[in-house]
């Protein structure tokens, strides 16, 4: 049974529905963010809508903070693209005691709330980190069919040397065959909940023995729990690139014409004023085609 009960977690819900009748063939896409990612999340949604006008998508944003201005922008975005956007303001008290780092706050655990919340509501949810920009079609994800016992479709992170490192550190030998990045999760909601993944993950994150091993918080935990129950799909759906790499003399940029989602890992994000590099272009195009078009990029503080 889930430790994240709806009545305890969801404080407020705001629905901006400008597609009057939800299509039967709709892809539900969810984000879990704190206030620092509201700007990025809005533009991420705009980028998906901009590149997938022929697909019906409904968006779900789980956050612990939203201002009236933010609500207006998300409403305007839904209206602009004749779409449906839902904002859920959540109580994070049960998550704040879990491990966190400078780069990963308790907001990283919102994906557990998301996967539990949609049980008996939707069969499939695409969870995305908010520091992404879409530049291609996601129709294959809309049409994706899970195989028996498959809990999620995922994208591998890095290379076999990294997988072997994770397998050793996390005392899970099977991870040597593949370790995924949790910024993209196409989740089979029924299988996730039948396997009690969220509850098991929280238990592990409260276990000192496990906490001493993990370095990538819920990503490490999910790799252990979902081991053998995921399908690895194309890197084009989670093409990771750190804008900080641009400071190097030579950089290998994996983003290409086939890339669907650029995932801007690392501390510098495309909404930062100093992220003025070609790789930020997909984000800036979507920003210009959204209610955030006149918002300044963030300056150094």
Predicted regions and their residues:
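A glycosyltransferase accessory/donor-loop signature
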Residues: 1-33, 182, 187-301
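Histidine-anchored nucleotide/phosphate-binding helix
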Residues: 35-52
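Short internal beta-strands
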Residues: 57-65, 153-155
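Active-site-proximal specificity loops/subdomain of glycosyltransferases
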Residues: 70-117
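Short alpha-helix within the catalytic core of nucleotide-sugar-dependent glycosyltransferases
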Residues: 72-75, 120, 135-147, 198
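Short aromatic/hydrophobic "clamp" motif used to bind/position activated sugar donors
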Residues: 125
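Catalytic metal- and UDP-sugar-binding loop of GT-A-like glycosyltransferases, i.e.
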Residues: 128
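Conserved donor-nucleotide/metal-binding helix-loop-beta segment in metal-dependent transferases, i.e.
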Residues: 132-166
